[in-house]
């Protein structure tokens, strides 16, 4: 009898909650109710709210009023249409409701609350991916593309594709990011020099605009929305499906890390390699810095060589690591040794410091996962990450190196995290898309991927970032920030430069009430 009574009470409480309108906040701080008639799967429990309030950056904490866990794209569209001009249902009122903010959230890997919606509604895109029919990843019959739910992680796209012997051609270093999240920024990594960023490898999108309109777009169908959304920081619509280009998947990878003590040789070899388009060229290229005032990670190298690698870093204070990979399978096996031999003979690295591993294709692409596991075990993953990612014009990279790397980083008492340093080709980017790059044929991707672990204050690392930006400003180095977070309109206008007027026009066209992605702080 007691158990029956308890079950009845739980049923009644659940029914009561489901029949209670959800209270959120409008732009003006006014209470707005989401009416039951919208039939939305809305979560307001403390765990859901807390999970949506912070991100990988672990610097901001902005509570939404509610989290939408949609089972269909029509739920998202209903939410946005209501936000544009529904009714408040507050004390029987039938006057138009005040607008409220809406943000799509994938894996929450933003750095400064870009996927937050303070007081508004965060749309959990993972829910949408889990409900996708017939599946979150559908490979075409001919294997040339995949239709992917935007909340799907790239690692799941990879798994589904390689099962069919195909693969996307360009990747981020970390695969546990949502497809919609990277396409809203650019999606860059070691294949970008050859295939462009991930946004350059999309055939078609399904998007729900800020007005709640469900639209399919491509270079020929609704092209303004297509090009605007790709790299558009979530300002024009929520991507719900992406058609991703696929190619033949290799099975194995020759993965090399090659050490340089001379920056000029490092720079020369990197730029030569990204210019090679024949079969002897590499499929992946990145660069990293190993500095004596930071943690020197020697885990990639054979145990017998780790001591001399560490000694090389200590002797020179800084070592430049060229990281390249060449893919192969049974059909291309004969050329692999030729490529490795050419690299060993023609590159200007420190003699005896070229190291090669032979690994499965999946393991190579998923390589950062092992680093994540290590950091999690040490309690150093869920810490503040005041990262700085910038694109530096190739013509000024020597000045940047001398002023920032030698002048700032090497003079720090200690450095934390990874420093990325590698060039890419601008002609692999589509200028019609919203993403901004320096106006030069070759520009460098610089990533100061710092972590504030232990007693370190993230503000100290942020101050270093500010010094880097200030040095570039004072030196006339026209950088473009990536994954940036500006809080002043003039900074956004400067960032977009000649694209600003078009960006603003598209905002008015697709999200006139400025509801979407308020955490970017572009139109707030």
Curated annotation (Swiss-Prot):
Matching InterPro entries: Cytok_DH_C_sf, Cytokinin_DH_FAD/cytokin-bd, FAD-bd_PCMH, FAD-bd_PCMH-like_sf, FAD-bd_PCMH_sub1, FAD-bd_PCMH_sub2, FAD-linked_Oxase-like_C, FAD-linked_Oxidoreductases_BP
Statement: the UniProt record of this protein carries the keyword Signal: yes
Signal peptide start and end residues: 1-26
Pfam families to which the protein is assigned, alphabetical: Cytokin-bind, FAD_binding_4
Tissue expression notes: Expressed in trichomes and in developing stomata of young growing leaves. Strong expression in stipules and in the root cap, but not detected in the root meristem.
Localization annotation: Secreted, Extracellular space
GO MF assignments: cytokinin dehydrogenase activity; FAD binding; primary methylamine oxidase activity
Annotated binding of FAD, by residue: 104, 106, 108, 110, 114, 173, 178, 184, 188, 239, 482, 517, 520
Cofactors, names only: FAD
GO cellular component, one term: extracellular region
Job description of the protein: Catalyzes the oxidation of cytokinins, a family of N(6)-substituted adenine derivatives that are plant hormones, where the substituent is an isopentenyl group.
Protein name: Cytokinin dehydrogenase 4
Species: Arabidopsis thaliana
Lineage: Eukaryota, Viridiplantae, Streptophyta, Embryophyta, Tracheophyta
